[in-house]
Each structure stands twice: as C-alpha cells, then as structure tokens.
C-alpha cells in the first residue's frame, strides 16, 4: 500500500470526528440559555447546609455559598476538613460539624432545625463498588437524613437539592443507574405531601474548582464543555442557590440537566451583579 493512500485512510476518521465535534459545538452555541428574571424577592436561604463539601461537587457548592452575600451561615457536615472548609470557618460563615454516621443525625438535629436548604453532594464512583455499598451511600444516606430532618425543621418551607447523574433511566441495566433512579424516586416520594421539596441535578462531567483541578481534569472539561456536556462545580452551587431563591418557580420532583444548571448559574451571576446584599 502506498504511503499517501495509507495516510488518507488514517486521517479520514480523524477528520470526520473533528467535523462532528465542530458541528456539535456550533449546535450547542446556538442554544438559548437565557432565563427570565427573578419575580419578587428571593426566597429565604440565609442558612444552608452542605453535605459532601470535601468532594469535587461539594467543594464548588461551598465556594459558591461562601461568595453569596445573601447566605449568612453555612453548616458543613463532613468527615474531614479541607482548605475551603477551613477558609469558611475562619471567615465566620461556616459552622463545621465532624460527623461519621450518615444514617443517624440525632447529634446534629438542633443545628439543622433552622436550615432553609440542604445541598447534598455525597457520592462515590461505581468503579469497584458493589451494589449494596453504592446503594447505601447514594440512597440510604440521603433518605435517612430527610426522614430525620423534616420532623425537626422549624421552617415553613425547606428544600433538599440532590446531585444525581445525567441520562439515567429506569430501563438501564447498569447498577449505578438503577441506584440513582431509586434515590430520586425515594426522595421524591418521601417529599410528597410534606413541607420539603426535592430538586435533582443531573450534570454530565463536573469540572473541579480552579484550586482543585489537575491537568487531566482541565483537559476533559475543555473538551466536553463546548459540547454542552460539562459543568463547573461552582455552577452547580450557583444553580442550587438560584433555584432556592426562586422558591415556587420550582416544584418538588423537578430535574435540572447540564444545560439547565448552566442557565440558572448564569441567571444567578446576573442577579448578583445587579443587586446588593441589602436588596
């Protein structure tokens, strides 16, 4: 086989992939991501709690909450401290509680009674993990929490924001998908008829915060973001804060995919840039 022909054979798939990638980028760029302005005053979210703040998504949520002038207190429930958590504690905005048993919350019920919204980011990869352990962490942990939080809450309306996963379906044969679906259905079902609403967030690839990201993660984020298949961890936090502030615009059982997360994070940034803490 002659060299020019071999080169053509090798390059053709690469060119096709590049063209498909470019087409995807163009399609995503044309999507309208604007969100209407917040109607009325923001719903109360002066006091929030974050579970999983030591992980990738949780670190971004905490970073967003620390930067929000409308959030007075952030309860961080964690097994270990991180530089971000320490920064929050030193600022006086974060109350850190070391907690080891995520099936029993009796020791922290009093401090959680005054929480307006909970941002739940506890999770692990399914690689090398059996179904029982994965279900314990992704289903049993959050269910145990909401079952114990709702009865002691002193607030009239509370919200629970759960990080799920993109493209999940009850028809899937994958273990981790089944468990994510079970988690959503269990949380939505429990919230029905209570003063708590549950919102699920279904991001694709989550890019770590600038301080935590390594070269490989930056490369993956840079590849997937133009395709609309990546979101920054801080954007998840901003979207959660915006959804919380919009109150009745969202109902229990609502789900936000990557595009919606990015849209509401953008709406959050726009609102913050045009208002002051006193407004």
Name what the model sees in each region.
Residues 47, 124, 132-136, 140-181, ...:
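Conserved Rossmann-fold NAD(P)-dependent oxidoreductase catalytic core, especially the SDR/UDP-sugar
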Residues 225-253:
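C-terminal helical subdomain
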Residues 72, 185-210:
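Conserved beta-loop-beta element that borders a ligand/cofactor-binding pocket
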Residues 77-84, 205:
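Short, polar loop motifs at secondary-structure junctions
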Residues 48, 90-144:
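NAD(P)H-binding glycine-rich loop region in Rossmannoid oxidoreductase-like domains
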Residues 74, 139-145, 179-187, 233-236:
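Conserved catalytic Lys-bearing alpha helix of Rossmann-like short-chain dehydrogenase/reductases
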Residues 1-41:
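N-terminal membrane-anchoring alpha-helices
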Residues 36-70:
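N-terminal Rossmann NAD(P)H-binding glycine-rich loop of SDR-like oxidoreductase domains
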């Amino acid at each position: 086989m002659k060299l020019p022909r071999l080169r053509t054979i090798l390059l053709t798939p690469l060119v096709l992939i590049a063209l498909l990638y470019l087409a995807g980028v163009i399609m995503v760029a044309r999507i309208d991501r604007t969100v209407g302005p917040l109607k009325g005053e923001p719903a109360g979210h002066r006091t929030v709690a974050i579970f999983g703040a030591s992980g990738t998504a949780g670190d971004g949520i905490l970073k967003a909450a620390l930067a929000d002038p409308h959030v007075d207190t952030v309860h961080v429930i964690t097994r270990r401290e991180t530089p971000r958590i320490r920064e929050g504690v030193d600022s006086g905005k974060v109350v850190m509680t070391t907690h080891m048993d995520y099936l029993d919350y009796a020791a922290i019920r009093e401090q959680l009674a005054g929480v307006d919204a909970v941002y739940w980011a506890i999770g692990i990869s399914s690689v090398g993990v059996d179904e029982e352990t994965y279900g314990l962490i992704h289903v049993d942990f959050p269910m145990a929490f909401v079952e114990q939080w709702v009865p002691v809450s002193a607030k009239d309306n509370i919200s629970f924001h759960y990080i799920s996963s993109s493209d999940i379906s009850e028809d899937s044969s994958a273990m981790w998908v089944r468990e994510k679906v079970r988690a959503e259905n269990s949380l939505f079902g429990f919230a029905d008829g209570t003063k708590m609403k549950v919102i699920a967030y279904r991001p694709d690839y989550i890019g770590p915060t600038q301080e935590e990201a390594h070269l490989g993660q930056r490369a993956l984020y840079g590849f997937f973001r133009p395709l609309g298949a990546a979101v920054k961890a801080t954007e998840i936090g901003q979207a959660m804060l915006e959804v919380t502030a919009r109150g009745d615009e969202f109902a229990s059982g609502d789900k936000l995919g990557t595009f919606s997360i990015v849209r509401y994070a953008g709406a959050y940034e726009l609102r913050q840039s045009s208002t002051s803490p006193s407004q």
